[in-house]
Amino acid sequence: SLFRGKAEMDCGYYMLVSGSRMSGGNVLADIEFFTIEEGRTTDVNLVMRDAADQLRVIGSFDSEMKYLSVPADEISPLSPVISSESQRVEKSVLETTGRGYFAVALVDYGTEPTNHAFMDISAVASELEQWGRTILVVFASEEDYRKFRAQDFNLPSTVRYGIDTDGKMRNMIASEMKLDKGGRLPLILVADTFNRVVFFSQGYSIGLGESLVRTSKSL
């Protein structure tokens, strides 16, 4: 990045403009003026403004991304997953969630980070249901999906399920959020259908469920 080190510039009077795009579409801007003199080094701070009562746009997520949607009757809180592959449909995230905000959790099966994430989300299920937006749980593979047992958790009723059969969703998230090697599952984000990401987490962090609730209440 140009701002990480020194840069040679012509002598003169300069204006440095920076901006932080917020979830509401507004931009918090900062303007700094400085002079470059011959033979002298000028240090200028790059200021990225923030607001505690607003969410920043921190990345992008393509809401037209396709995944394999799993019919509701495949997952029951009282029984293991039952395959009915002929009823599965490739859909976009937008088709599933409708316009507005949504959450996506790209997960594997049986790992400690994913299990902890599911337990955290289960603990705040009622509050996430009050938010009323779709939470799309996408399994990283068919194998991960087949092993999942919904009855092991108390996930919100607003959860929908799917499979990232070709890994394209994971690759897209990793590219947009600048993650190495596909990131650490689970990858959890809150975004809108204008493709703006306002919350992101990879792996497991303590208080994940509460963080999702706080984010939902700020939208």
Which residues make up each language-model segment?
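Exposed aromatic-hydrophobic patches
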Residues: L2-E8, D43-L46, I163
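Structured interaction patches on ligand/partner-binding surfaces of diverse proteins
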Residues: S20-A51
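Thiol-/selenol-based redox modules, centered on thioredoxin-like
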Residues: V47-S69, R184-L219
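A short beta-strand-turn-helix
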Residues: I75-F102, G110, M119-A123
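Structural microenvironment flanking redox-active thiols in thiol-disulfide oxidoreductases
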Residues: F102, L106, G110-S157, K168-I173
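Structural micro-motif
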Residues: P156-R160, S175-L189
